[in-house]
């Protein structure tokens, strides 16, 4: 068992419980034990199929494999789980679920978050028949516990957007970290292309809190964020950051920029659609006063990075005054965030670096 998988199991069951004998649940490890991403319960096919909703790969091959495995599960054969392990019952977690929901025989699936010092464990909580009751987030590291706490605070300030954002069922200290139990959002995975439903949701979001900021203030704020990580980067990265800030300053220093509440990680995999309405979850990166448009920038860049396409195929930043400067600041801020949270995320970091260099070269 890898160290990451062991840590997730310990967090789930409790370190002491995980090492004791007693009832154990079998989980399939996807895509493999060497590269664990999701743990799906094996047994009752209804709970297994519901757990597969938790596993949402976007790569074509992984989606095909998921579809094939779901068809096998429907036959009732459990031999499909080639990579599996047995995990002790999470007694503390079961007691919490019973207290909050009344369900005394919950079934669980687990999702390991992105690698890095903010890595979290997300646990899908279901009834034995497969109905999802909610999701538990647990910080695996101390910094990730702070992020879970941040998400709880954000959700408690977004009650006006319910039921299109999760509701906090429970939040509090747990196993020297922090735990958030939130309600599920319903629907199918959201589309990978920006549409009217995305804009409608973002307009409702920004209506919660809106303020105007001098453009130069935004440049200084992003500069401070960048400097927190730039000192440990190669001098070429430092030069790229300095050039980006100088270019953005020239674009924005005489402008006033509307800002408001932003999701911070607005992307297809954090959305669901039902009856033509968008629901959004995973709010740990929420910001009170981000420039309007940063969520749409992020959505487009994340999709373009995943599909290895140019972000320029999605929208034109020359469409309005200051848009290019704001895009430069978004890229630098996003690059700083990725370097801080996932320094080994080569593709995401490299995509943003190349996008910055390309945009700066276009204006030189």
Predicted regions and their residues:
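Conserved kinase catalytic-core helix
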Residues: 151-166, 185-226, 242-267
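Conserved short submotifs of the Hanks-type protein kinase catalytic core
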Residues: 177-187
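ATP-binding glycine-rich loop module of kinase domains
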Residues: 119-149
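Short beta-strand micro-motifs within the conserved protein kinase catalytic domain, predominantly
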Residues: 167-177
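Juxta-kinase regulatory segment immediately upstream of eukaryotic protein kinase catalytic domains
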Residues: 2-111
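Active-site Asp-x-Gly
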Residues: 274-316
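Conserved catalytic-loop position in the HRD/HxD motif
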Residues: 265, 270, 282
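ATP/Mg2+ or Mg2+-diphosphate-binding catalytic cores
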Residues: 311-312, 337-364
């Amino acid at each position: 068992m890898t160290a990451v998988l062991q840590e997730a199991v310990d967090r789930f069951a409790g370190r002491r419980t995980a090492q004791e004998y007693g009832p154990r649940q079998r989980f399939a490890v996807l895509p493999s034990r060497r590269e664990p991403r999701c743990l799906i319960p094996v047994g009752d096919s209804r709970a297994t199929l519901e757990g597969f909703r938790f596993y949402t790969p976007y790569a074509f091959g992984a989606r095909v494999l998921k579809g094939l495995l779901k068809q096998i599960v429907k036959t009732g054969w459990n031999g499909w789980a080639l990579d599996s392990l047995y995990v002790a019952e999470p007694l503390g977690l079961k007691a919490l679920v019973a207290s909050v929901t009344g369900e005394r025989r919950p079934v669980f699936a687990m999702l390991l978050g992105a690698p890095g010092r903010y890595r979290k464990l997300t646990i899908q909580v279901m009834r034995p028949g497969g109905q999802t009751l909610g999701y538990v987030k647990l910080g695996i590291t101390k910094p990730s516990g702070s992020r879970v706490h941040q998400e709880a605070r954000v959700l408690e300030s977004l009650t006006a957007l319910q039921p299109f954002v999760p509701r906090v069922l429970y939040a509090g200290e747990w196993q020297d970290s922090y735990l958030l139990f939130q309600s599920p959002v319903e629907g199918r995975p959201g589309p990978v292309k920006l549409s009217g439903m995305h804009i409608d949701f973002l307009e409702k979001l920004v209506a919660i809190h809106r303020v105007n900021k001098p453009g130069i203030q935004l440049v200084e704020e992003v500069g401070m964020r960048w400097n927190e990580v730039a000192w440990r980067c190669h001098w070429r990265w430092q030069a790229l950051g300095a050039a980006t800030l100088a270019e953005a300053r020239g674009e924005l220093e005489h402008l006033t920029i509307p800002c408001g509440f932003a999701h911070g990680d607005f992307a297809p995999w954090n959305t669901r659609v039902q009856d033509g309405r968008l629901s959004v979850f995973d709010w740990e990166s929420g910001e009170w006063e981000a420039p309007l448009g940063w969520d749409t920038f992020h959505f487009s860049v994340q999709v373009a990075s995943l599909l290895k396409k140019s972000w320029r195929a999605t929208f034109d930043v020359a469409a309005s005054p200051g848009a290019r400067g704001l895009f430069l600041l978004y890229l630098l801020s996003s690059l700083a965030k990725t370097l801080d949270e996932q320094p080994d995320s080569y593709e995401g970091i490299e995509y943003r670096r190349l996008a910055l260099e390309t945009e700066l070269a276009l204006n030189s």
